[in-house]
Amino acid sequence: MNTQARLTSTQWKARFKGYVQVTKPGIIFGNLISVAGGFLLAAKGDVDLVLMLASLVGLSLVVASGCAINNCIDRDIDAKMQRTCKRVTVTGEIPLSHVLLFGIALGVLGFGILALFTNTLALLFAAIGYVVYVGIYSLYMKRNSVYGTLVGSFSGAVPPVVGYCSVTGQMDMGAVILLLMFSLWQMPHSYAIAIFRFNDYAAAKIPVLPVAEGMAKAKHHIVLYIAVFALVSTMLPLAGYTGTAFMAVTCATSLWWLTMALKGYRQDVDMPRWARQVFGFSIITITALSVTMALDFQAVSQTPLFTLVR
């Protein structure tokens, strides 16, 4: 009996771990930082803790839902990739229908929290980001188009905008800059992953840029997107949304990231190692900017492009 009980306990622990893994906790944590950054930038020191908690929890559940359903959709290509071949949706450790229902339940709960505590615009952005990620990117673009990364970058840029709009209830220039900034950041971040995971993507026949059009073109795009990202990031302080501290941090991190990317043109470059460095510093860059904009906000007058309040 004791042995059987221990075995059952072990199985339940493994099952729980599997459910956690399908939500991709690393992605959730990264999005939490960007949501908090957008929220605190908009709040400008006048923080509604209940609203902030609801925005963080609601959006995290929505992201977790999208990731779980993405695991269901990608199970066939995940089986061909070394990095993902042991996911529970591939091994059958958890039935596919259970993961799908789990994802739906997370989505209902997440959208419910956003609907109850935030406003129409924040909810709308969360819904659009979800549809783009699950319905357009995961179901079609990722498998069939080199532009899948570009489409997916929009959904990846939604979380800070949801945080921002939860406070303002309006789409102003600050929200537009955040959307552009985080969309641009996604591109070199994702291309770097595609380079050091090249063999996996090639095996699964996923037409990411390095696989579909070559490493050289991917390097050009990485440098170009980092350069444009650096310029767009300066718009927050130039438009008065943040101060000199943010300007200093964005210039320092972006220029260092760009310098790192340019090293990819060396003749003797170790491409996988270089790509991992570009990827790693992309996380440092966006984390630093999210934290700095949360602290270095300015009381700029917000002129809405349009307003949707609850």
UniProtKB/Swiss-Prot annotation:
Record's bilayer topology term: Multi-pass membrane protein
Enzyme Commission identifier(s): 2.5.1.141
Subcellular location(s) per record: Cell inner membrane
EC top class, as a word: transferase
UniProt KW keywords: Cell inner membrane, Cell membrane, Heme biosynthesis, Membrane, Transferase, Transmembrane, Transmembrane helix
Membrane-spanning intervals of the chain: 25-45, 49-69, 98-118, 121-141, 145-165, 176-196, 222-242, 245-265, 277-297
Pathway where it operates: Porphyrin-containing compound metabolism; heme O biosynthesis; heme O from protoheme: step 1/1
One Pfam family linked to the record: UbiA
GO molecular function terms noted in the UniProt entry: protoheme IX farnesyltransferase activity
Gene Ontology biological process terms, A to Z: heme O biosynthetic process
Disulphide-bonded residues: none
Catalytic activity line of the entry: heme b + (2E,6E)-farnesyl diphosphate + H2O = Fe(II)-heme o + diphosphate
Matching PROSITE patterns: UBIA
InterPro entries on file: Protohaem_IX_farnesylTrfase, UbiA_prenyltransferase, UbiA_prenylTrfase_CS, UbiA_sf
GO CC annotation terms, alphabetical: plasma membrane
UniProt similarity note: Belongs to the UbiA prenyltransferase family. Protoheme IX farnesyltransferase subfamily.
Further comment: Carbon 2 of the heme B porphyrin ring is defined according to the Fischer nomenclature.
Protein's job: Converts heme B (protoheme IX) to heme O by substitution of the vinyl group on carbon 2 of heme B porphyrin ring with a hydroxyethyl farnesyl side group.
Annotated protein name in UniProt: Protoheme IX farnesyltransferase 2
Organism: Shewanella sp. (strain MR-4)
